A protein has these predicted regions:
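Short histidine
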Residues: 161-172
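N-terminal capping/small domains of soluble enzymes
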Residues: 1-10
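Alpha/beta enzyme core
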Residues: 9-126, 133-156, 170
Length: 172
């Protein structure tokens, strides 16, 4: 199945609408991409985004019975706030380094986050520069329980559709 992770639009109703659409399409989990609040491109396109408080995240979490993912976590404190908000899973991610220049990578912060969540029932995923199974294993050795791979699959899809994605999967 596929998880649907949406951007942190200003209006909660916009987020809930996208959750409902994803549920109807068969999503197995729903989430919010917190680091998307820093994306200037969204604002330039007239899309209102904003950071969310723990109370706002709790309210959004109540809108679905599916597992709830929060993406864009980069500190142990943020991870603990996500736990408080009711997240089932976090994605340690710096959004490909496109939100803040000089931001550490997932591998830099994973050990501290994993330590902070030790013993908690929260899944820790990570993304960023996963180009091989070895890259995935490195992130998992640092505390992730799984990884996300996006950009190489997009390259394959743009280049040759489904066949391109299959080629990327076979190559990596």
């Amino acid at each position: 199945g596929v998880a649907a992770i949406v951007k942190p639009r200003r209006e909660t109703g916009d987020i809930v609408l996208r959750f409902r659409m994803a549920e109807e399409a068969g999503a197995v989990a729903l989430g919010l991409d917190l680091d998307g609040a820093g994306l200037v491109t969204m604002r330039l396109q007239g899309q209102a985004v904003e950071p969310k408080t723990v109370d706002q995240l709790k309210a959004i979490r109540k809108e679905t019975k599916l597992p709830f993912i929060i993406k864009g976590v980069m500190t142990a404190d943020e991870a603990l706030l996500c736990l408080e908000a009711g997240a089932d899973c976090i994605v340690v991610s710096n959004h490909g380094g496109r939100v803040l220049d000089g931001c550490p990578g997932a591998a830099d912060v994973l050990p501290e986050i994993a330590h902070a969540l030790a013993g908690c029932r929260m899944t820790i995923l990570a993304d960023g520069c996963v180009r091989s199974g070895v890259d995935a294993l490195k992130l998992m050795a640092l505390g992730a329980q799984g990884v996300l791979v996006g950009r190489p699959l997009c390259w394959g899809a743009y280049a040759a559709g489904a066949e391109g994605v299959a080629t990327v999967l076979k190559t990596y």
